[in-house]
Swiss-Prot record:
Superkingdom of this protein's organism: Bacteria
Role noted for this protein: Catalyzes the synthesis of GMP from XMP.
EC identifiers of the protein: 6.3.5.2
ATP-binding is among the record's keywords: yes
Name the record gives this protein: GMP synthase [glutamine-hydrolyzing]
Positions with a binding annotation for ATP: 221-227
Domain GMPS ATP-PPase span(s) in chain numbering: 194-384
Keyword Zinc found: no
Molecular function (Gene Ontology), one example: ATP binding
Glutamine amidotransferase type-1 domain span: 4-193
Keyword tags: ATP-binding, Glutamine amidotransferase, GMP biosynthesis, Ligase, Nucleotide-binding, Purine biosynthesis
Active site (record annotation): 79 (nucleophile), 167, 169
Organism: Christiangramia forsetii (strain DSM 17595 / CGMCC 1.15422 / KT0803)
Length: 509
């Protein structure tokens, strides 16, 4: 059915955000690099051109051939896209006298224009550009302006091509979602039929057809992605799904046992493997973050390969790959090195030569959670904070020892349980504790101490690309600090990380 939206990516940092806003309207969309336009466009109802870090005036500026699209499908050209049509089709683009970054207010000039229906007067929009459209392209009609940008929006007569200089996908554009809805539903005629329920039905049907009676092996992590992937596959192929949950000794306190029990209660065919001693041995003497990651990854492959060999006649390896991973692997900036490139590569473990099945590969993180809810997965599992693949190894700065893991598990448990008790857990996107490679002087009773320092970290975010530190109540921080110092032997100082991303990252390593 022709109801999909094609998003052409020109390298903008906001391209994935466009796709998420479209999906929020229950409309399916896919992202393609601007130079890899699908040959078959029969399934698409509309096209959106993204912004770009390039200037259309630059010699190496993206210049795609849109002849198979223009005049045949409705087009919404965002930022660079708007300048592209002007620059290459009879208009003029020059450096702005006043660079416009941030908030601006929109004045709609053209009355009764469907693109701006139900959008408030002086609506706030988000600008991010240093070039301006001085002259509109051939047959261009101005639709809106701001105080600094004369041609903030226009359309091209004789075709359903609309261009806007601002970013409707960014939250700061207060009516951006309405504008996208106007374009996609009222102008392009797409239908809002992309729902979690429909995705589940379609995916289960496709998995049954693709996998049939073959066996599938899946490594579970306890995270949202692998859990939802497992339940979807189980719904499609039942006991032919073999799940392996590896304890690397770097999980949170009691996590291995509690999550394994939850998986079994869900009816999954899962085997728990305690390989904690093997991982700690592989990490012995390592302090460099990348060396630690590599050691954990290699050990996991060895453990998983050993366990996968116990299952006879496995054909497929399932992965919890989600859409941002897929987009990155075919991005404008070139493919990243990912596990997906491992097919039939000599020298790799046998399980990595299996056929790949990725039931979530077209979903964003928030959609994975909605699908999980549709599948009836416990909200506690779905609402869990993101947790790094290497586990506590990258929250213990420096070398790893069993004693350091014990200390951090206790500290982390007190912090996370405190967030739950204070009804703060669901207001935080990610939280955790970090064991620092320093000791500090303290006083306990009449004795001088020289013990470990731990940092607490809590951030709010939408997707982890950017993050702000959470202003937790002082009373909560005070109580948590006191509890940690009194209960965890070996810790005498607690600090709270108030760094945002950027410039800092969420994890310390």
């Amino acid at each position: 059915m022709q109801n999909n939206v094609l998003i052409l990516d020109f390298g903008s940092q906001y391209t994935q955000l466009i796709a998420r806003r479209v999906r929020e309207l229950n409309i399916y969309c896919e992202i393609y690099p601007y130079h890899k336009i699908p040959e078959d466009l029969s399934g698409f109802k509309a096209v959106i051109l993204s912004g770009s870090p390039f200037s259309v005036r630059a010699e190496d500026a993206p210049h795609p051939d849109l002849s198979q699209i223009r005049g045949k499908l409705p087009i919404l050209a965002v930022c660079y896209g708007a300048q592209y049509f002007a620059h290459f089709h009879g208009g003029k683009v020059e450096p702005s006298d006043t660079r416009e970054y941030g908030r601006a207010n929109l004045t709609v000039i053209k009355d009764a224009e469907p693109l701006f229906e139900n959008i408030k007067e002086n609506s706030q929009v988000w600008m991010s550009h240093s070039d301006s459209i001085i002259r509109l392209p051939e047959n261009g009609v101005r639709l809106a302006s701001t105080s600094d940008v004369l041609n903030a929006a226009y359309r091209i007569e004789g075709e359903q091509t609309f261009a806007i200089q601002f970013h409707p996908e960014v939250y700061h554009s207060t009516d951006g979602k309405q504008l996208l809805e106007n374009f996609l539903i009222k102008i392009a005629g797409t239908k809002a039929t992309w729902t979690p329920g429909k995705f589940v039905d379609l995916t289960v049907s496709e998995l049954k057809e693709k996998v049939g009676d073959d066996k599938v092996v899946l490594g579970l992590s306890g995270g949202v992605d692998s859990t939802v992937a497992a339940v979807l596959l189980h719904k499609a192929i039942g006991k032919n799904l073999y799940c392996i949950f590896v304890n690397n000794g770097l999980l949170r306190k009691n996590e291995f046992e509690s999550v394994l029990d939850q998986y079994k209660d869900m009816g999954l065919n899962v085997k728990g493997v305690d390989a904690s001693a093997r991982f700690l041995d592989a990490l012995k003497g390592l302090s460099d973050p990348e060396e630690k990651r590599k050691a954990i990854g290699n050990t996991f492959i060895e453990v998983f390969d050993d366990e996968a060999h116990e299952i006879k006649d496995v054909v497929y390896l399932a992965q919890g790959t989600i859409y941002p991973d897929v987009i990155e692997s075919v991005s404008v900036n070139g493919p990243s090195v990912t596990i997906k490139s491992h097919h039939n590569v000599g020298g790799l473990p046998d399980f990595m030569k299996l056929k790949i099945v990725e039931p979530l590969r077209m979903l964003f993180k928030d959609e994975v959670r909605r699908v999980g809810k549709e599948l009836g997965i416990d909200k506690e599992l779905l609402g869990r904070h993101p947790f790094p693949g290497p586990g506590l190894a990258i929250r213990i700065l420096g070398d790893i020892t069993e004693e350091k893991v014990r200390i951090l598990q206790e500290v982390d448990h007190i912090f996370i349980q405190g967030l739950r008790d204070w009804m703060l857990y669901d207001k935080v996107w990610q939280a955790g504790a970090i064991l620092l490679p320093i000791q500090s002087v303290g006083v306990m009773g009449d004795e001088r101490t020289y013990e470990q320092v731990v940092a607490l970290r809590a951030v709010e975010s939408t997707d982890g690309m950017t993050a702000d530190w959470v202003n937790l109540p002082y009373e909560f921080l005070q109580k948590t600090s006191n509890t940690i110092i009194n209960r965890v032997k070996g810790v005498n100082r607690v600090v709270y990380d108030i760094s945002s991303k950027p410039p800092a990252t969420i994890e310390w390593e």
